[in-house]
Amino acid sequence: MDYVNLGKTGLKVSPLCLGMMSYGSSQWRDWVLDEDASRPLIRRALESGINFFDTADMYSLGVSEEVTGRALRDFAARREDYVLATKVFNPMGDGPNDRGLSRKHIFDAIDASLRRLGVEYVDLYQIHRWDYQTPIEEAMEALHDVVKAGKARYIGASSMFAWQFAKAQHTAERHGWTRFVAMQNHYNLIYREEEREMIPLCLDQGIGLIPWSPLARGFLAGNRTR
């Protein structure tokens, strides 16, 4: 496996990242593999040289993080041998502060994710969506503090407009806070809107691109027709 730098960081990742949305609990979605069915695939990924694993707190409502963490602890020789990413934003409960990018929720969410994953830190902590109800200054400072607390090595973003991503980066730069190093955007041969603004922005700024749904949820793999 040839490894590449994630954006302009020094972090080495496999060109293929195993997305963990399909691993967790079939009670959440009927297309999700339960733990026993997930583990052989995760093990095979590690044996093939894949060292990059991306999950989120909301995948199977936390079960994906638990399954991912247990498998990586069992199959990887050392914590240093894999790059672990997770995300924050989506609802994790019924409470008004169980979602979003408020300072409160980010702090609560990173601790909960680390407990479920069974690790002391994640390599990449990503905001899953843009929060229209929280000032970006609050979110970026909270993410900076997560990094400074040693709970995340880098931060990234996912699924937003290019102007929003640029605003977040400018906010962080203006205040001397940690900036995003990666963008996880929706991109494949069917959905190519990201070629208009987001991808050129990221290439210009040295931001790592982690496209989600690269096979268009199976359409490009030939196993779905609708």
PLM region descriptions:
Residues 14-15, 77-82, 86, 120-124, ...:
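Short acidic capping loops at alpha-helix termini that bridge into adjacent secondary structure
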Residues 31-45, 99-118, 141, 165-170:
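Short, acidic/polar
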Residues 3, 134-226:
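Beta/alpha (TIM)-barrel catalytic core signal, keyed to glycine-rich beta->alpha loops juxtaposed to Asp/Glu
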Residues 93-126, 178, 186, 190-193:
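Active-site gating/metal-coordination segments in enzymes
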Residues 75-101:
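Structural motif corresponding to the early beta-alpha repeats
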Residues 22-36, 92-107, 128-133:
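Active-site mouth loops of central-metabolism enzymes
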Residues 1-82, 120, 148:
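N-terminal binding-site loop/beta-alpha segment at the start of enzyme catalytic domains
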Residues 6, 18, 38, 45, ...:
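Conserved, mostly hydrophobic/aromatic
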